[in-house]
């Protein structure tokens, strides 16, 4: 038997975003990337630690600032898709307007008609093709993309967010720069076409606090340097789900009223602290989709809990479910500790509950790196594979749980393929 390590599916990233960088020296210089850790990625771009992108390495443009992020991606691949489309609006199928498609079709029809009606046209094209074959092979030239202004970036972002593909994703825009937000607001007020569904805007960093833009789960980081998001953010939610499903005797689906077997079925748990609602994944998703009344919707964005009637976000439940179903080793250690405590103190019910809760909390704190967030984000075992940078473009493999992965030491090639707008 070989020693090849089998990689299992990772939990859904607790946070992944596409970001827009701006040079503080030359505001016209902009850069697009994606990352699960904005705080770390920014200091890499600024050369504080190794691992930055080549196109942001010019000292004359440093320091860079992260002015806005688009967050809410459920996987690294999803963020990469959005990042590439934002970087390459000329080639992205998501930004091809119906008008340009119609013009291309008309041009194609005219070409076919000219070929069919004029034989000389066809012969001349054949001769030119032969001459190209016989001649010196044409050297491929590197495509130089036209520089884009800030308004152009806004326009491309706006078109992406209202495209058929991305408009159904639970995406949010978080602004860290007050003047960039004001520029966006002034630009958006001039646009005739609105987004298909309201995209939540979160004002952070130097932006003024406006309660209308704040949501229950959309906390302000206070700045990019504080944007270090780990699974510790939903620790209590994960603990509650583990306790509810550890003894499945009385676990029933609140939608179909059927018995739930957590070890065999994907089970959702309400994130509200006082609610013990459990449902089959398919039952709850069908209920949410039916209530949304959107014909093209397949995956729900949010819905009303059938027990407590609170509005709950579907992505949040999926993050907890993916951790519970995919981080098997962590859960086994937590449950083993809990059951040992239950056996030792089974005579005193109240003490059992309190001690188990405290033990699990300590264990989760260790796993989530509550007291060492930087080490957790950079080096923690299974998470590092999940938190690989899109623009780092290096496949970081999982290490044994007892060892820490080495820190990034190489300068990383651009995920943008050298298309940062350096003016």
Curated annotation (Swiss-Prot):
Annotated PROSITE patterns: GIY_YIG
E.C. code: 3.1.-.-
Claim: Transferase is one of the keywords in the record: no
Main localization (coarse): nucleus
Enzyme category, top tier: hydrolase
Listed GO MF terms: 5'-flap endonuclease activity; crossover junction DNA endonuclease activity; zinc ion binding
Ranges for domain GIY-YIG: 14-96
One protein family per Pfam: GIY-YIG
Names of the cofactor(s): a divalent metal cation
Subcellular location: Nucleus
Assembly description: Forms a heterodimer with slx4.
Functional note: Catalytic subunit of the slx1-slx4 structure-specific endonuclease that resolves DNA secondary structures generated during DNA repair and recombination. Has endonuclease activity towards branched DNA substrates, introducing single-strand cuts in duplex DNA close to junctions with ss-DNA.
Family classification: Belongs to the SLX1 family.
Record protein name field: Structure-specific endonuclease subunit slx1
Organism the protein comes from: Aspergillus fumigatus (strain CBS 144.89 / FGSC A1163 / CEA10) (Neosartorya fumigata)
């Amino acid at each position: 038997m070989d020693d090849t390590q089998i990689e299992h599916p990772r939990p859904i990233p607790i946070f992944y975003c596409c970001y827009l960088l701006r040079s503080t020296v030359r505001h016209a210089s902009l850069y697009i990337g994606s990352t699960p850790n904005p705080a770390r990625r920014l200091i890499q771009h600024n050369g504080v630690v190794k691992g930055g992108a080549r196109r942001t390495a010019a000292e004359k443009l440093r320091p860079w600032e992260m002015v806005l992020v688009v967050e809410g991606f459920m996987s690294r691949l999803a963020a990469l898709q959005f990042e590439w489309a934002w970087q390459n609006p000329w080639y992205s199928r998501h930004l091809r307007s119906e008008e340009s498609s119609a013009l291309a079709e008309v041009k194609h029809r005219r070409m076919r008609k000219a070929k069919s009606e004029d034989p000389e046209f066809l012969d001349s094209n054949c001769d030119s093709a032969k001459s190209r074959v016989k001649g010196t092979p044409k050297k491929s030239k590197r495509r130089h993309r036209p520089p884009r202004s800030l308004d152009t970036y806004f326009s491309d972002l706006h078109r992406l967010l209202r495209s058929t593909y991305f408009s159904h994703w639970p995406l949010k825009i978080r602004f860290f720069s007050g003047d960039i937000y004001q520029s966006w607001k002034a630009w958006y007020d001039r646009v005739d076409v609105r987004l298909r569904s309201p995209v939540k805007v979160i004002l952070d960093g130097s932006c003024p606090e406006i309660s209308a833009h704040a949501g229950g789960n959309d906390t302000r980081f206070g700045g990019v340097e504080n944007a270090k998001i780990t699974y510790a953010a939903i620790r209590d939610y994960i603990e509650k789900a583990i306790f509810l499903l550890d003894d499945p005797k009385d676990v029933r689906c609140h939608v179909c009223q059927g018995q739930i077997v957590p070890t065999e079925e994907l089970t959702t748990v309400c994130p509200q602290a006082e609610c013990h609602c459990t449902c089959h994944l398919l039952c709850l998703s069908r209920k949410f989709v039916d209530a949304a009344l959107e014909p093209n919707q397949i995956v729900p964005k949010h819905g009303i809990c059938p027990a407590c009637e609170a509005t709950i976000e579907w992505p949040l439940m999926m993050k907890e479910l993916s951790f519970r179903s995919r981080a098997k080793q962590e859960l086994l250690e937590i449950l083993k500790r809990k059951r040992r405590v239950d056996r030792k103190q089974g005579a005193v019910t109240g003490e059992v509950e309190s001690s188990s809760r405290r033990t699990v909390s300590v264990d989760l704190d260790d796993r989530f790196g509550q007291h060492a967030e930087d080490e957790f984000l950079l080096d923690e075992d299974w998470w590092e594979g999940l938190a690989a940078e899109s623009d780092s473009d290096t496949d970081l493999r999982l290490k044994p749980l007892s060892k820490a992965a080495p820190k990034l030491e190489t300068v990383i090639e651009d995920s943008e393929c050298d298309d940062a707008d350096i003016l």
